[in-house]
Amino acid sequence: WSFQWKTKTSIVIPTPFAAHGLLYVASGYVGDREKHVYAIRPGAKGDISIHSGEDSNKFVAWYDKRAAPYNPTPLVYGDEFYTLYDFGFLACRDARTGKLHYGKERINPDKPAGFTASPWAYRGHVFALSEAGDTYVFKAGKKFKLVRVNHTGGMSMANPALTGDRLLIRNQTHLFSIREKK
């Protein structure tokens, strides 16, 4: 199968991924007018492009032309699809239907931050590592709620890595290995 982007996309960075039996594909280059997210059902054949006036079809569960980030890959955690935008906003929608729960909430109104690393989730929380090295912790769910901010003290642009029981966070000067107390 294949589909054609509704408009030309200049640069594609977010990684496609699967959850809830759907394949999620996003492309939101900062210079593009439209920033597409598609949730694709399995079993497709042929051309599954979205046509004018459509936001879904037989093989596209949902589509939004203004929902994609530039650098971070979106996250599905529980039943929610989270979009972390490079310029410091977080949005949440239903992962299966695309219905918006909250849109583009400013992560930190007092200290605007950029985001390159992709978000991750653990034990009911969504985490976002800013380029300034601050990790923002949100309560997972349909309502936007910032719980806390952790500081690493250095510029961070790399995606955190999960390995075994550890979370690895790299910044400009340090590599942090974090795990739960036993």
Predicted regions and their residues:
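Noncatalytic, solvent-exposed loop/strand surfaces
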Residues: 1-182
